[in-house]
Amino acid sequence: MKDAYLYVVEKSVAWEFDSPEYGRLARKIVELLYERKEDLTDDRIAILLNISTAETRRILQYLMKLNLIGVRKKTTEDYRIEYAWYVDDEIIRQAISSRARVVREKLSMLIRSLTEGAYYICPSCFIRYSLDEAVNWGGTCPICGTQLEYVENVEEINKLTKIFEKLEKL
């Protein structure tokens, strides 16, 4: 489960900041937090990983927004508010179950739409069209002009249903 969590962290950050490097950096931050099993401030994380504090804060705040890491607020002796970040097994479990729930909802909608309608696909550019779209375009692909082919959804629905059932077990 930890590997799936790290994958989600890396890809989410890479996608948000349009930078695979930021994704790898987020993965390092989360691995550090998980391995140390303690709350660390953003300054301490930046020092341990030898990266800028600004980048660290940016990544940590984004991960917090996605509920992929935990944060605790502390007041220092001089009455400053300091944030301490952590990752534990409960955070990982919640993150994975949350993602699984979102995927289950989307799969459910996709399975429902596939069972309720007929679909056609362009054999050249592999774009799927509903029956209404295929009729509107006269049975040809509007992009390349190739004749659209009817898609038998039974196999696809069965595959999606199996994936849905696996996700329900998480």
Swiss-Prot record:
Entry's Gene Ontology molecular function annotations: DNA binding
Domain HTH TFE/IIEalpha-type: 1-93
Family annotation (PROSITE patterns): HTH_TFE_IIE
GO BP terms: regulation of DNA-templated transcription; transcription initiation at RNA polymerase II promoter
Keywords: DNA-binding, Transcription, Transcription regulation
Disulfide bond annotation, renumbered to this chain: none
Gene3D superfamilies: Winged helix-like DNA-binding domain superfamily/Winged helix DNA-binding domain
Source taxon at top rank: Archaea
InterPro entries, sorted: TF_E_archaea, TFIIE/TFIIEa_HTH, TFIIE_asu, TFIIEa/SarR/Rpc3_HTH_dom, WH-like_DNA-bd_sf, WH_DNA-bd_sf
Pfam families associated with the record: TFIIE_alpha
Protein's job: Transcription factor that plays a role in the activation of archaeal genes transcribed by RNA polymerase. Facilitates transcription initiation by enhancing TATA-box recognition by TATA-box-binding protein (Tbp), and transcription factor B (Tfb) and RNA polymerase recruitment. Not absolutely required for transcription in vitro, but particularly important in cases where Tbp or Tfb function is not optimal. It dynamically alters the nucleic acid-binding properties of RNA polymerases by stabilizing the initiation complex and destabilizing elongation complexes.
Oligomeric form and interacting partners: Monomer. Interaction with RNA polymerase subunits RpoF and RpoE is necessary for Tfe stimulatory transcription activity. Able to interact with Tbp and RNA polymerase in the absence of DNA promoter. Interacts both with the preinitiation and elongation complexes.
Family in the record: Belongs to the TFE family.
Free-text comment about domains: The winged helix domain is involved in binding to DNA in the preinitiation complex.
UniProt-recorded name of the protein: Transcription factor E
